[in-house]
């Protein structure tokens, strides 16, 4: 387990009494804060990033701490705000698989020609399905891919509201799934 952790301050604290609770946390308190974040965020790397940001925000704003609550409660409030911001950011830019992930999979199957043939057939079905989409959906899909999936940049490029981009992409996904695999 982690030993008791004391965050050292190399500068003079603004109020010596106000920073004591925030700057001195035990391993149990840090673990409780980590558990608070883990309940809401499942990705371990994101949990670590958010936890680190909580401490940075707390140190940056320690002069605003009023002692109306426990330092742990104040830190949980900061964590909750950062978690909300994290999910807002994720909503604006959806997850996309990288092509590098496919390279590793292809290397594992390099001796199996049937896998390559199936991949080419599936790619052909996807291209055919995209060609069957209405022009406005094709354009939104194309620009979205060029903008790395960023809805706002796609909307700005096309000169349409962000809601229109989301709607067209959603309908395009549904149509593509139905055309590629009607039994799914």
UniProtKB/Swiss-Prot annotation:
Family named by the database record: Belongs to the sigma-70 factor family. ECF subfamily.
Gene Ontology annotations of biological process type: DNA-templated transcription initiation; symbiont-mediated perturbation of host programmed cell death
Location of the DNA-binding region in this protein: 151-170
Keywords: DNA-binding, Hypersensitive response elicitation, Sigma factor, Transcription, Transcription regulation
Motif Polymerase core binding positions after renumbering to this chain: 49-62
Organism whose genome encodes this protein: Pseudomonas syringae pv. syringae
Function, in words: Sigma factors are initiation factors that promote the attachment of RNA polymerase to specific initiation sites and are then released. This sigma factor is involved in the activation of hprD as well as other hrp loci which are involved in plant pathogenicity, hrmA and avr genes.
PANTHER family linked: RNA POLYMERASE ECF-TYPE SIGMA FACTO, RNA POLYMERASE SIGMA FACTOR HI_1459-RELATED
Entry-linked SUPFAM superfamilies: Sigma2 domain of RNA polymerase sigma factors, Sigma3 and sigma4 domains of RNA polymerase sigma factors
Transcription found in the keyword field: yes
Domain of life: Bacteria
Pfam families on file: Sigma70_r2, Sigma70_r4
GO molecular function annotations of the record: DNA binding; sigma factor activity
Protein's UniProt name: RNA polymerase sigma factor HrpL
